[in-house]
Regions:
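Glycine-rich helix-loop "coupling/hinge" segments at transmembrane-helix boundaries
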Residues: 135, 210-248, 270-275
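Short cytoplasmic-facing helical segments at TM-TM junctions of multi-pass membrane proteins
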Residues: 158-200, 229
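Periplasmic/extracellular loop-to-transmembrane helix junction in inner-membrane transport proteins
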Residues: 21-22, 48-91
Length: 275
């Protein structure tokens, strides 16, 4: 059936598919562009009204600083180092949170054992973790560890909820017919978990970047975005502060888009798996 539907899709004229998709894409992007331009205009008006770059740097000044940063060789090394640490922490949290939620769904005593530390991690301020980790191990992997700790509870809670909502009759059917565990995972469990995993990733990416950069600002590991933000604060370079903030936002959006794209590809691969 999937092969026939794929064949029917291929038989449609290319110009028909392109024409059908173009208006939807335009409708999607036009409000976003208008909103961005409107807020940039508000920002420019506020900067002109204040009249002090040290308080509010204008968008033009930030764009100029950003251009100088991008042209320098150290910018890419700095951005890559911070992104690598934060993405590593995010991926570790997704893997660890998913595994712990899976084990907790199978054994009640594991769920009871994990509940206090998960809840504690969710409630303790991120700055407390940062200071403790600095005392215990320095700043080399601080951003990775803090990002992982902040994202882990969100992933654990979301995956736990998804596992609890997997249809029990399907799992019982798989058990009765002695379906292999890997087949049960790919055909029953994984499809039910995709919405929860996607939701966890949407929330987790933002948490990872906020926590990771905060850790760098406090820990000051050399050659990181957090160190550059701290230097901008020290020298009251508001333009640099805004420019590096724009870089963080852009990297966060890129990370989220990449994660969702990879999840989408994985979901499509599981769509054709049956019992």
């Amino acid at each position: 059936m999937m092969a026939r539907s794929a064949t029917r899709r291929l038989e449609r004229p290319c110009d028909e598919r392109a024409g059908a998709g173009r208006p939807a894409t335009t409708r999607h992007w036009v409000p976003i562009v208008v909103g961005v331009v409107a807020w940039l205009a508000v920002w420019q008006i506020v900067a002109m009204a204040v009249g002090q770059e040290i308080v509010v740097a204008s968008p033009l000044r930030v764009a100029q600083v950003l251009g100088h940063l991008v042209a320098s060789g150290s910018f890419w090394v700095t951005a890559a180092r911070t992104a690598g640490h934060i993405v590593a922490g995010f991926l570790l949290a997704v893997a660890l949170g998913t595994a712990l939620a899976w084990v907790a769904s199978l054994h009640r005593w594991v769920a009871a054992l994990l509940s206090p530390p998960i809840r504690l991690t969710r409630l303790v301020p991120v700055v407390s973790f940062i200071i403790l980790l600095l005392i215990w191990g320095g700043s080399a992997w601080l951003a990775t560890t803090v990002s992982c700790l902040m994202v882990l509870p969100a992933v654990f809670d979301s995956i736990s909820e998804g596992l609890a909502r997997v249809p029990s009759e399907l799992r019982e059917m798989a058990r009765v017919f002695r379906v292999p565990r890997w087949r049960t995972l790919t055909a029953i469990t994984a499809p039910a978990l995709w919405p929860y995993l996607i939701a966890a990733c949407r929330v987790g990416v933002g948490l990872a970047w906020k926590a990771g950069v905060s850790a760098e600002v406090i820990g000051l590991p050399a050659g990181t975005i957090g160190e550059r933000l701290s230097m901008a604060k020290l020298y009251l370079a508001t333009g640099d502060l805004f420019a590096w903030t724009a870089v963080i936002v852009a990297l966060g959006i890129a990370t989220e888009r990449l994660a969702l794209w990879l999840l989408g590809r994985a979901e499509r691969r599981f769509e054709g798996v049956g019992l």
